[in-house]
Amino acid sequence: MLVAALAWVLFVPAADWLAHQDVGSATGTLLQTARDAARGRLLTLGAGLFAGAAFLVAARALVLLRRGQVNDRYTKAIEQLGSTELDVRIGGIYALEGVARDSARDHATVMEVLTAFVREHSREQWPPPDSPRTTWITWRGRFRTSGRQQERFTRPDVQAAVAVLGRREARHDIQPIRLNGADLTGADLIDANLGGADLTEAILRDADLTRVDLTGATLRDVDLTRADLTDATLRSADLGGADLTEATLRSTNLRSADLQATTLTRATLTRADLSSAFLGGADLTEATLAGADLGGADLTRARLFRTDFTRADLGAATLIEATLTGAKWPAGSPVPPGWKLDTRTGRLIAAAGTDPGPVT
């Protein structure tokens, strides 16, 4: 009935109105010809409207179909994630990555699921306590058997989840990646994009973070003992209280980073960019900063015992109350008051008859 009523309106009143608009008060053959022409135009318009409506209906159906397919894939992937089989869990992780890649609206949900998975399972021992004496080198895909006590590494499924997080489409993020408290000992984070991530109190001992992007990330009290951060970017990152004992930070960008009370004992910071960084109270005992840029850095109350500053740029650096005993001073840089340079070793020693204590 509705279609019939619409057709009557199109072909009778509307056609008459259009015809009169074309020929005015004419009658007879001229009026009939105008009516036929008007009906033709209305037919064309009606066909276009019908085709447009059909297209919209089909497009809507396709969207719903794809939405249903994505939901099915997501549900199946979640089921796989809860499997007791390692390979099935890893398959579920990569399936979730596919969902996030194909559906921007599901990106944030998938990333939250994966970060929760990492936080929940990363502290479980790997290899399992009841496994043979096999040490898995998960980030290289190799293993070796030895009579030594098992070493602990990141679980392969947790490693897979971290890898997915590290290569996600960050432009779809709604909130920062939260890996606070996660144990990623020995994890492979090479080239990972974790800018702005929260890694508070995470454990990254012996992890490989070569070229990782941690710009603006929160790494307070994180354990980075012996971690490799070569060419990494930690610009404006918060590393307050972090432990970087024996860590490698060659050519690492730490510009404007907060390193307050950070432990950098025996760390290697060759050619690192520490310009405008805050290292108040940091411990750099026996650390190597050869060729590092410390321009404008704040080293107030820092412990710099036997620290190697060879060729380092200390322009405008603040050394208030810093301990400099045995520090290897860069040639040409002014020696702080109360200290003198041992020309044989190139290290700072207390000036004769003085006890300089910390630099003030």
Feature names for model-found ranges:
Residues L81-G82, V118, Q150:
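Alpha-solenoid helical repeat architecture
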Residues M1-G52, R142, R168, P358-T360:
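Short hydrophobic membrane-inserting helices
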Residues L86-D87, R155:
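Alpha-helix N-cap/helix-start positions at coil->helix boundaries
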Residues R171-T360:
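Tandem repeat scaffolds
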Residues T84-E85, S103:
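Short inter-helical turns and helix N-cap capping residues of alpha-solenoid HEAT/ARM repeat scaffolds
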Residues A51-D72:
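Transmembrane signal-anchor/signal-peptide helices with a preference for the extracytoplasmic
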Residues V99-S103, F117, H121, V164-H172:
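Residue-level signature of the C-terminal ends
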